[in-house]
Amino acid sequence: MAKTKGEKRNKSAINEVVTRECTIHLAKRVHNIGFKKRAPRAIKEIRKFTEREMGTNDVRIDTRLNKHIWSKGISLRYRSTPFRVRVRLARRRNDDEDSPNKLYTLVTYVPVPTFKNLQTENVESSDD
């Protein structure tokens, strides 16, 4: 159907502040990657997943998540990143006036005992 002239367009949901909790399957994203490149590639894949999921170009990764990804290192002994990781994606307003992006996404690590039966959930955001 064609829109009539008087209809208002809906606001985009991308401009809202929202927090989601997701599971990222890292094993399929770093498959066939050399062992020395797995942790850096996992960080890049988390960024890519977050950009697609939240619709923001400015993605900031928390240090706890970075340490968890790098916990097994790149040595020959462990050789791998965690298979899955549970993260909280928080889209927030950017307070910096000279930034080109109005919103940014903060990615934080959520420790879970098991990944069974977890779904993507909207979380009530608590601003720190």
Swiss-Prot record:
Keywords: Ribonucleoprotein, Ribosomal protein. It comes from the Eukaryota. GO terms for biological process: cytoplasmic translation. One of its GO terms (cellular component) is cytosolic large ribosomal subunit. The keyword Transmembrane helix does not apply. The keyword Phosphoprotein does not apply. GO terms for molecular function: structural constituent of ribosome. Belongs to the eukaryotic ribosomal protein eL31 family. PANTHER family: 60S RIBOSOMAL PROTEIN L31. This is Large ribosomal subunit protein eL31. It comes from Drosophila virilis.
